[in-house]
Amino acid sequence: MKKHKEYSSLDLSKIGEEILSFWNNNSVFDKSIADPLRPENFTFYEGPPSANGMPGIHHVIARTIKDLFCRYKTLKGYTVNRKAGWDTHGLPVELGVEKEMGLTKEDIGTKISIEDYNKACRVNVMKYKKSWEEITSQMGYWVDMKNPYVTYDNKYIESVWWLLKQLHEKKLLYKGHTIQPFSPKAGTGLSTHELNQPGCYKNVKDTSAVAQFQIIKDEKSQFLFEKTNQ
């Protein structure tokens, strides 16, 4: 008896649908992480996507690479738990909501309550959740979508605080000073990723005012002439 089905023609879409159907109907992924004969764990952390943006081909490529490692470790006898997650922290979410509602940061707490503003952000940040779930299933990416972690959830935030406490107690955190890009409009610092958002930089023309004064060279003004050609 043949273990695997043979195909006379390569209709890749049809073959893919049949394999996905077999995996789903037989709960293959669930069985692979619940097998008692797999006592050793391989730890895998799923970097969460942001569900307020549509999935793209680069996400498919990255997930394919991650899936290869997880499936290989599964074949080697490891239990490979992989929990899905949603990245919900980020300035782009806030700016998107403010643009849709015609608000500025100054309007929060006056024209709109903080509670309503937060609700709008929670809705916006999960805007394309269904699209992500569909493409995850279609590409056969094995990850636990039933019990995802959500970064705005208090349990997740508390776990991050706990980790920071551990770092602090081990004296791995220190206070320092560094120059960071800042957005006056948003009232917050900007990450490298946020600096690459469309519309962050614009070429503008401005008028510079230059005033000239005569300087008398004496002891009081001597510092102005130091290390110059005078």
Feature names for model-found ranges:
Residues 1-230:
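N-terminal, positively charged nucleic-acid-binding surface of large information/translation enzymes
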